Amino acid sequence: MTRRTDAHPDLNRTDAGAPFFSTWSVGTPLRQRQTVEAIGATWERRPWPSDGLLGYYVYTGHDASTLLHHSQWRSEQAYEAFVKTHRQERVDEIDTAVPGIERLRLDRYRHYRSVRRPDDTRVPGCIVIVEIEFEESAADSRRAWVDAVIEALESEPDPHPGGISGHFHLGTDGTRVLNYAEWESAQAHIDALAAPGDGIGSARQEWERVQTWPGLKSSTVSRYEYALGLIPDRTRP
């Protein structure tokens, strides 16, 4: 069966060979809450759909309109099998409960690297999603860019205390990078952006290198709050 969990996902788990991120637009804070509840109810009344799905997580956007979805699959083949057999009935029930949901896009990624203090056990109060797009000609430099970001983070002389972790993913489309960053609170992230420098880092050569990387096309930053976690219930048949 399916059960809810308050635990945040482990972005480092090695068996999650195909992490996906998608975004829905629902329009208002009330519809955000209604959609989260509809998702939970729809999934909980059904058996867990596949051993290939490790967990499914939903977050409410601080823009008061969007929902972020993160699903951890063992493989893309497991997801495609789910689409053929189990997805549509769930979509139909959710859309009946909350009509007018706009499903913006689904992006497929592979986890590349993470950075986190080993002794930091804080539960994040805010998830910051940083999406970076590269020119197609610069696709092969995405790993080097992530390495440069982590080098800048780890060499930061005065890191903001509100940052907990960063989890960098490479899009299978060849042009995208996504950083799933855990922060103590939204205010901590806002304060970090307001500090001297461009972004969360100080005005140093390492950050300038990251921000002026050849082929870097655009970037967006969005803040979310964890709303729902769904995992298989191994205690029930």
Region annotations inferred by a language model:
Residues 1-70, 74-237:
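Short S/T/G/P-rich N-terminal loop/turn motif that feeds into the first structured element of a domain
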